[in-house]
From Swiss-Prot:
Regions of compositional bias (Polar residues) in chain numbering: 40-54
GO molecular function: GTPase activator activity
This protein's encoding gene: yihI
Organismal lineage: Bacteria, Pseudomonadati, Pseudomonadota, Gammaproteobacteria, Aeromonadales
Keyword Transport annotated: no
Function: A GTPase-activating protein (GAP) that modifies Der/EngA GTPase function. May play a role in ribosome biogenesis.
Protein origin, superkingdom: Bacteria
Annotated source species: Aeromonas salmonicida (strain A449)
Protein name: Der GTPase-activating protein YihI
Amino acid sequence: MSAKQPNRKPTGKRKESDASALDGRERKRAAKRKGLKAGSRQQAEQSSKNNNGKQAKDPRIGSRKPVALIVDEKGAKPVAPKPAKEKKLVMTPEQELAAIENDDRLNDLLDRLDAGETLEATEQAWVDQRVDRYQELMDELGIIDNDDDEEDDGSFDDASYEAPTQPASEEELWDRFTQVDYQPEPKPEPKKK
């Protein structure tokens, strides 16, 4: 009988042919790469656009203005700065007064104040600024606003009216107006006969 040879366990890797090894390496490289091939995208664009052999000149390259290679003191002219133009719209005082009187935002905020609402600090500051400017324009133009002092319906008799003993100054009236608990000064009733 012949002696039985012991079973061999495979040692190492299985041998592959050159073609299968090359295919495996290519698949491994392709799996590692995630993006496009390396290269310049401008080259790819140029090759796709310019197939007719005629190359278009890039307008960014070069300059049309000649450059002096020698510094010449005569040729150097100081460039005068251009005067800055005022783009601010200048309004006459009459136009500005009309604009303030027709300002919807100001009218809405004044209506809210008359209704007893309290405004935010920024809104109140804006209203104060506009009212102050309105007063300045009225003084500048010499316009006196008498709409609040007299009634136009004619039911008011001057002879029966008694003036208050001491009229309130503008500062006192303004202080009362700016207070939260402002109460208007009561008007005296005309005397009955």
